[in-house]
Amino acid sequence: SLRHIKPFILLGGISFIVMGSEGAIVDWSALYLQEVTLAPDYLVGGGFFLFSLCMTIARFFGDQWSKRFGSIQIIAFGALVAGIGYCLVLSGNTYLALIGFALNGLGFSVVIPEVFRIAGQSNTIDPTKAMSVVAGFGYSGFLLTPVVLGVVSENFGLSVGFLGLFISVLLVLILTYFLRKKNTVRS
């Protein structure tokens, strides 16, 4: 029933937003650095590099952090770190934006593994169905968000597009509050 799937729709929303942001950074960070912060050519790939590097390194520690703090707290903390990262990206300063992309990688690194962990521990529906819902939302976000960002940026500018990503990360914080209230998901 829909009542049993509802927590996984929340997880799917988080997955959509976070994987969407990942896709947007992969596709748009270099152009953002080039056009908005006016970064020199040798730094335009730095946003994606630092994002990927921090994401990779932090994923090695995610399980330890999860055991210590719990999945929902890790998701909220990751969204908070990514939100701070977007604030730095939106500063318009090349070096602050580079640090911001690094913080995006650090923050987002733990969110998707935790979302998948929660879905896989479902006690209300088959965990494979829960994972399918969450992964489907996430990959849809990864594919659609860069396109939407392109349309928004074409009409309003890259800064507005990245502001939208920042706002969406704030939405993740709100969704974790509602996720915490659900009894069907172990944190």
Segments the model singles out, each with a brief description of its role:
Residues 6-49:
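Extracytoplasmic gate region of multi-pass secondary transporters
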Residues 33-34, 65-66, 120, 148-157:
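Interfacial helix-cap and linker-helix signal at transmembrane-aqueous boundaries
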Residues 46-55, 137-138:
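Transmembrane alpha-helical segments of major facilitator superfamily
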Residues 73-87:
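Structural signature of the two symmetry-related core transmembrane helices
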Residues 85, 95-103:
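Paired small-residue
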Residues 110-123:
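Intracellular juxtamembrane helix-capping segments at the cytosolic ends
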Residues 125-158, 165:
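A late C-terminal transmembrane helix in Major Facilitator Superfamily
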Residues 166-187:
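Multi-pass alpha-helical transporter architecture, strongest
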